[in-house]
């Protein structure tokens, strides 16, 4: 897909470097949408009788055991459909990419490592579950799909077969 997008972008007049960046962005978007679809289209999804819809896999901080499962219509317009999942990812990208007029800085920093350039500012996004939630184990569900779809675009992020567990 990426090569087709790059070829089409170059054919539309984009310089080679911009066509390659555009193709990378499109492939990344598609991979994120596929990950979202996988969350709603697997054998561990349940049916919510109150909402009348398929519920995604991660309703809690663990992969549940289910006795029966619900299937989403991937070709439809409801929860779990390609159109819905890709639309959700597109909405997220729009929010992230919309300029706020303020300078923002986002970094991934290992909480166990000293890093003094924040000068007294503390931002924590991890709830206080400590070892109760195995984030790395849960991340494997999405990681394996992303590794297969965009692992070659981001080799530093996907150099291991599964999410590294030691840092957790």
Predicted regions and their residues:
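Switch II (G3) loop of P-loop NTPases
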Residues: 128
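Hydrophobic residues in beta-strands of the RecA-like P-loop NTPase core, especially within AAA+ ATPase
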Residues: 124-125
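Nucleic-acid modification enzymes, centered on SAM-dependent nucleic-acid methyltransferases
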Residues: 1-121, 133-168
